[in-house]
Amino acid sequence: MEKALAYLGEESVITRDFHTIEQADKVILPGVGSFGVAMDNLKRYELDKVIHEVCERKVPFLGICLGLQLMFEGSEESEGVEGLGLLEGKIVRIPDTYGLKIPHIGWNSLHLQNNGRLFQNVPMDAYVYFVHSYYLQAKHEEIVKATTEYGVTIHASVEQDNI
């Protein structure tokens, strides 16, 4: 992320410091790994609290991969572990009943819908790279801005207010 932002001419700070995040004018929560472990780490450093605070103040917030999953209410990957609950819906495992390989690794076309801000300059059905075993199911279809197909319709991107 840091190199991509630098390439775009944006300054960034990698931190888990509450006050640094609290003062940021934009926040990105990337992530790779386990939903439960990630939530434990957010709570350990009180980052769950500062994430709620910046989102309530309408600071632009981008969750990428696991960072996006954590914004939801929970995940089948870590039953009983609550997510941040900033978006309604859940994270579910891609079913292996279709004979598809799990994890899903590879290029898929992105189907844009509902006029998302993030993909304004991306053509319909552009190919993007996926590496995942779980995907999000947003409770409200109107926040879904991009989907892809991998045995099931996968909500690949959502937007709600500043998130």
PLM feature spans:
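Short, charged N-terminal beta->alpha structural module
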Residues: 1-6
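Pocket-forming structural segment of enzyme catalytic cores
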Residues: 74-149
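A glycine-centered loop/beta-turn motif at secondary-structure junctions
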Residues: 139-140, 148-163
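Structural alpha-helical scaffold elements that stabilize or flank donor/cofactor-binding regions
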Residues: 20-21
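Structural motif
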Residues: 28-30
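An anion/phosphate-binding loop that grips the pyrophosphate of nucleotide cofactors and donors
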Residues: 24
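Cysteine-nucleophile active-site neighborhood
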Residues: 33-105
